Amino acid sequence: MLNCSNQKHTVTFEEACQVFPGGVNSPVRACRSVGVTPPIVSSAQGDIFLDTHGREFIDFCGGWGALIHGHSHPKIVKAIQKTALKGTSYGLTSEEEILFATMLLSSLKLKEHKIRFVSSGTEATMTAVRLARGITNRSIIIKFIGGYHGHADTLLGGISTTEETIDNLTSLIHTPSPHSLLISLPYNNSQILHHVMEALGPQVAGIIFEPICANMGIVLPKAEFLDDIIELCKRFGSLSIMDEVVTGFRVAFQGAKDIFNLSPDITIYGKILGGGLPAAALVGHRSILDHLMPEGTIFQAGTMSGNFLAMATGHAAIQLCQSEGFYDHLSQLEALFYSPIEEEIRSQGFPVSLVHQGTMFSLFFTESAPTNFDEAKNSDVEKFQTFYSEVFDNGVYLSPSPLEANFISSAHTEENLTYAQNIIIDSLIKIFDSSAQRFF
């Protein structure tokens, strides 16, 4: 049981709205797409957080995927306490920085590779794009509709392209707008990707992609799609940039790279990498990373890059991921949680899709699992809102958007997973058959 009894004043969301735009410091936290008042967290432990009204929630948001070990893991807390006594940020290279980078490259089996630490996934993807443009001396970046790579102007928006408009794409390079240099294509559509690269390949600096999409809900890749990205980049001399901010160290220790046997030019890590503190990294062969200053001529800098405290917590978090049986334990939790929900959906014939890869999952109110953003956004928003309110009112906190991912952590107990599972099942039953209720 968590305790906030020492709190003298119950801070409310209304107060947050007086000091933050929309009451939050990142938009989705406002819960506007699900119609509930956002909880204000007072403390968290394991798989539970407590809000300022004393309500306990089983947490499946997990710091948006950063907390694979749950909240306040003793070894991570100890790393913070021990490290903070030596300082928090030096603005200089630290011993911990070097040790952590060396351990990462070794454990990820990346020979002849280097790392550049930054403080956020946005910084990492922004730097990767700058590298791609600087190395190739080209301007165009390709991403995929529904894919999220941070909030830098260079990777937001873009052109939604179909085969009919390919002939007009060459005009893009003459328009001096960041978005005009970004082409957004449908995810999982190799045919359109091939057409665009045939037309513009020699002008494409790089292709950035999520191996498993996590910001249109969980959308899994078709077997050949990721291979096509890598092959086309090699063929046209473009850089392949794989964004594993969400999937890295989560779907497997070596991430989606291991699952799909991929060798991108640059890989982006974040979230789990920092152990709950702000840290991210771009990793690539030294022939690529050495283009960054001061070794090369491409600029990137950051006051907090590789800061001492985040390096120590990240080091502790990744070591925990390497502990014997860690991913086997996660697999057991996955099976315990997913299987009964999937069986209930099948047996009841609900038009709902539970999509999951490892400890990442999403519920779509659609007959079949989406394969791209257009299909994902066809999920029944009204039913999702009703569903979300039901689970929220019963102490289960899912990511507050139909197009966000949810996460299981190693801290989730079987008891809490079973409880959450029953709440999810009964919420679905309540929505589709109001006469059939087992737990409400």
From Swiss-Prot:
Q: What is its main location?
A: cytoplasm
- Per the UniProt entry, the Enzyme Commission number(s) are 5.4.3.8
Where can this protein be found? Cytoplasm
One GO biological process term is: protoporphyrinogen IX biosynthetic process
Which Gene Ontology MF annotations are present? Answer: glutamate-1-semialdehyde 2,1-aminomutase activity; pyridoxal phosphate binding; transaminase activity
What is annotated about its quaternary structure and interactions?
Answer: Homodimer.
Per its record, how is this protein called by name? Glutamate-1-semialdehyde 2,1-aminomutase
Species per Swiss-Prot/TrEMBL record: Chlamydia pneumoniae (Chlamydophila pneumoniae)
The organism's lineage is: Bacteria, Pseudomonadati, Chlamydiota, Chlamydiia, Chlamydiales
